């Protein structure tokens, strides 16, 4: 399947005095922590992140327009491609099914909490509602929606990326159907036996 954007398109090297947070597993790399960017990667692309001494820390997606310049996705030396995103989504969906097997309306993906910074996916009975809060997730929208719908066994998807935080990523607010329109008034939410 491969990455819709490409593999590592660059290397972000951190300042020696500013790499401890990323090495400790924090998913955000601020612009002030970066020493250099090699390879001229486009914003939104997957980059390798290295310590000040040059050792591998992880991989994430870059956005120079944001104060959070890199959002780390993994601290393993593994490719971050469409299959990687599919596995991470599958892990999140399985976890929800494990802790709340009867839930038909719940948060399936909660951004950094599920290792997918900038992505929120909620299920409302037969519909998935997406928020793409960062450029790195927004440009992968098609594969994230398609994979999520396949995993959930659903067809209906709606986007609610109408939040102000997108402006910090250089993105416009978005709201609307993802795919064929559907009658949202037919969706009835049930929780603990109540509708």
Model-derived regions, located:
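Carbohydrate-binding surface patches
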Residues: 128-132
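Non-catalytic substrate-recognition/targeting regions of SAM-dependent transferases
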Residues: 111-116, 120-122, 140-195
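Surface loops and adjacent helix of pleckstrin homology
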Residues: 61, 133, 162
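Non-catalytic accessory regions of SAM-dependent methyltransferases
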Residues: 1-125, 149, 175-186
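Helix N-cap motif at beta-to-alpha junctions
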Residues: 135-138
């Amino acid at each position: 399947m491969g990455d819709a954007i490409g593999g590592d398109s660059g290397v972000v090297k951190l300042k020696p005095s500013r790499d401890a947070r990323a090495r400790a597993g924090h998913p955000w790399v601020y612009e002030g922590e970066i020493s250099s960017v090699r390879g001229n990667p486009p914003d939104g692309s997957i980059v390798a992140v290295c310590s000040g001494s040059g050792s591998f820390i992880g991989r994430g997606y870059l956005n120079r327009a944001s104060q959070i310049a890199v959002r780390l996705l993994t601290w393993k030396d593994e490719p971050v491609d469409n299959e990687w995103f599919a596995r991470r989504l599958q892990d999140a969906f399985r976890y929800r099914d494990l802790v709340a097997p009867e839930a038909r309306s719940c948060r399936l993906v909660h951004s950094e909490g599920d290792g997918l910074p900038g992505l929120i996916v909620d299920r409302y009975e037969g519909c998935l509602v997406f928020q793409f809060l960062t450029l790195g997730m927004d440009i992968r929208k098609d594969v994230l929606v398609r994979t999520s719908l396949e995993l959930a066994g659903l067809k209906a998807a709606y986007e609610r990326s109408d939040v102000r935080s997108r402006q910090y990523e250089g993105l416009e607010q978005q709201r609307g159907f993802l795919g064929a329109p559907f009658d949202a008034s037919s969706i009835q939410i049930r929780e603990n036996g109540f509708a």
